[in-house]
A protein has these predicted regions:
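Hydrophobic anchor at the start of a short beta-strand
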Residues: 21, 134, 305
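Active-site mouth of glycoside hydrolases
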Residues: 1-123
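Catalytic-core region of carbohydrate-active enzymes that cleave or remodel glycosidic bonds
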Residues: 91, 107-183, 195
Length: 336
């Protein structure tokens, strides 16, 4: 039981640090035999694990890391998910992490989406598709490896967090810098070397100060994607009903008739705008060095406009008592 005793110590230590644990139950890169026991022994292992660890309040269940690479059938995954949910008396969060094929978070026993992807532009779609919390738990790592997945800057990592929260989703951080001792933080922890953690903490502080959960707003072109998938008669009726401008009607019609090319164009122009009802609006301009933005705010509310520099970690009030149409002046810098 030395393995389990060591695991207990780590779980307790992380809990004392205020850290939630997404515990991976099966692993395709396993070197200790857990991935080749067979289904019956898989369930025996899970039975013991759940009896031993379920009482910890800060633990989640990740059925697998990159589940498609393990030696299990779809039916076996169904059984594993059902077994974990049935034998966990405390109802911990439960999901499964993909490499290519995203686990279907619409499954009744799955509590949230656990997604590996570098395509930030689809986060809003996933939030709307699943109507559950979406955790982008592998968006690449801040570091300097030769691999695509381990070689983004701290600035890019910070941007990905803001893109996630402005899509209504969540994001996780990891770090993969080469070091003299040849130990990656991603694998063994230690001292963080990157520039994104303090910026992520700044992001978290702002998001936690808001009056509720942010919901992403699809851009205009993005909102046309469902329209393009309708039948022609229904689509034309919607266009005639909702759009007065002849030019805009032409643009929408051409978009809807342009197939996958138009959809790709729409995703390439994803706008990271979010709101909490009419209480709060958050616009992240990403790499766009905009000089201004025209905001359309409710006429019956009064708003304070604050300019956030996500990289320099500053927040400045630039206007108060604003409603209706307002032209916000921006500093023509990225990361605002």
């Amino acid at each position: 039981y030395a393995f389990w005793d060591a695991l207990d110590r780590h779980v307790v230590r992380l809990g004392r640090m205020g850290i939630q644990i997404d515990l991976i139950l099966f692993h395709p890169y396993d070197r200790w035999g857990f991935d080749g026991m067979g289904h019956e022994k898989d369930l025996q292992y899970l039975d013991y694990l759940l009896r031993r660890l379920s009482a910890y309040p800060h633990i989640w269940w990740s059925l697998a890391n990159e589940y498609e690479l393990t030696k299990r059938t779809g039916q076996e995954w169904d059984a594993i998910e059902a077994f974990v949910a049935e034998h966990d008396p405390y109802g911990h969060l439960l999901s499964c992490h993909n490499i290519f094929k995203i686990w279907d978070a619409n499954r009744p026993l799955t509590t949230h989406a656990s997604i590996q992807s570098k395509d930030m532009n689809r986060l809003g779609d996933w939030c709307r598709r699943y109507n559950k919390p979406v955790m982008l738990d592998e968006c690449a790592y801040e570091g300097n490896l030769e691999h695509f997945w381990g070689c983004i800057t701290g600035e890019e990592m910070s941007r990905r967090f803001w893109k996630a929260v402005c899509s209504g989703a969540y994001c996780t951080h990891g770090e993969t810098f080469y070091s003299d001792d040849d130990i990656l933080w991603w694998a063994r922890g230690g001292v963080l070397k990157g520039t994104s953690p303090e910026r992520i903490a700044f992001c978290r502080k702002i998001i936690e100060s808001l009056p509720g959960h942010l919901e992403g707003e699809p851009s205009f072109l993005h909102s046309l994607i469902p329209l393009a998938k309708m039948g022609e008669a229904e689509r034309n009726a919607r266009i005639a009903e909702r759009i007065d401008s002849e030019l805009l009607r032409t643009v929408v019609t051409v978009f809807c008739n342009s197939g996958p090319d138009a959809e790709s164009f729409a995703y390439s122009e994803t706008a990271y705008y979010a709101h909490i009802g009419t209480d709060c609006y958050l616009h992240f301009y990403d790499t766009r060095p905009a000089a201004r933005d025209t905001l359309q705010l409710p006429e019956d509310r009064k708003y304070t406009i604050q300019l956030i520099d996500t990289w320099n970690m500053t927040m400045e009030t630039v206007a108060e008592g604003v409603s209706g149409t307002y032209v916000a002046r921006l500093p023509s810098r990225e990361n605002m």
